[in-house]
Amino acid sequence: MGAPLSTTRRGMGQNLSVPNPLGFFPDHQLDPLFRANSSSPDWDFNKNKDNWPMANKVGVGGYGPGFTPPHGGLLGWSPQAQGVLTTLPADPPPASTNRRSGRKPTPVSPPLRDTHPQAMQWNSTQFHQALLDPRVRALYFPAGGSSSETQNPAPTIASLTSSIFLKTGGPATNMDNITSGLLGPLLVLQAVCFLLTKILTIPQSLDSWWTSLNFLGGTPGCPGQNSQSPTSNHLPTSCPPTCPGYRWMCLRRFIIFLFILLLCLIFLLVLVDYQGMLPVCPPLPGSTTTSTGPCKTCTTLAQGTSMFPSCCCSKPSDGNCTCIPIPSSWALGKYLWEWASARFSWLSLLVQFVQWCVGLSPTVWLLVIWMIWYWGPNLCSILSPFIPLLPIFCYLWVSI
């Protein structure tokens, strides 16, 4: 009988040269046909072998309970594939959501020098000048950050310039200032429009009053109607352009406008004279027209700062100049009064009359008040057209 192909035959499970994935070879050994006993190294001890991939490492019970092939097989080489159970740590419970615990505060933004260090390397002069503004500094260095020195907190009130162009998230503007700033001009505009409409009715009212003086029984119809220019019945104060009385109405209105303008000029002149803005020299006593040389008009200024003179000079016949101070108020009025008193001696009696009126008893004043009350309606009808001018005069008197 021939000798066997291999003299040495290893026991069961001793030959590890051939992989046994399915566990069909209990002794882990093949027939000599596969040259298992050759001089080639064992498979299990070959360093260049390819281990089983991780995909074959299935968990415990992948092929049913209690079935674990030897050496892992297709189930892999993990402890679970060998039938060894390990206890895995349980996952921590999920954190509570924001809906249950509430919104967490937003973390403070880090300074610019930490998040954008390249911006700190910019040596532009304009950039550093802009950082001098606390509002700009608060944008680049939040949460108390600073570039090199102590920073002031950003202001919470918008300035007048920044309130015009507001940014999103900027401080709210003060609506009280805006409301008060708009309410004043609106009230002034309303008052001006009201006075303008009233002033425009002054010529018509005065025209009616002027016409009524010619007709004591009442204002009749316009007498300017004729057959050549037939017009409807109307008052003489509202003649149409086709009426012959239209030119007379325009003439009366023009005279009324001149009268109102003269009244305003007189009021302005009185106001300026009251403020001392008319440096009119009073009548100089002892002045003569035969002087050999002129005298200075003014020597000093009022209080050293006023642009109006405070005294006037006169030169008598002997050639010496005499200075007379100008009144600080009512200079023109006093000049006119002294000039009129020098030519009309009876005007001096008015001074005594005024002084006498001041010393009247209360009974006389009550009598005067009763007369005004009795004749008041007629006086009001005459003076009513001038009532709209009263607020204007009062405003000018107070402002100037």
UniProtKB/Swiss-Prot annotation:
Systematic vaccination of individuals at risk of exposure to the virus has been the main method of controlling the morbidity and mortality associated with hepatitis B. The first hepatitis B vaccine was manufactured by the purification and inactivation of HBsAg obtained from the plasma of chronic hepatitis B virus carriers. The vaccine is now produced by recombinant DNA techniques and expression of the S isoform in yeast cells. The pre-S region do not seem to induce strong enough antigenic response. Residues 2-174 are annotated as: Pre-S. It comes from Hepatitis B virus genotype F1 (isolate Argentina/sa11/2000). Belongs to the orthohepadnavirus major surface antigen family. Keywords: Acetylation, Caveolin-mediated endocytosis of virus by host, Fusion of virus membrane with host endosomal membrane, Fusion of virus membrane with host membrane, Glycoprotein, Host-virus interaction, Lipoprotein, Membrane, Myristate, Transmembrane, Transmembrane helix, Viral attachment to host cell, Viral envelope protein, Viral penetration into host cytoplasm, Virion, Virus endocytosis by host, Virus entry into host cell. It is found in: Virion membrane. One of its GO terms (biological process) is fusion of virus membrane with host endosome membrane. This is Large envelope protein. The gene is S.
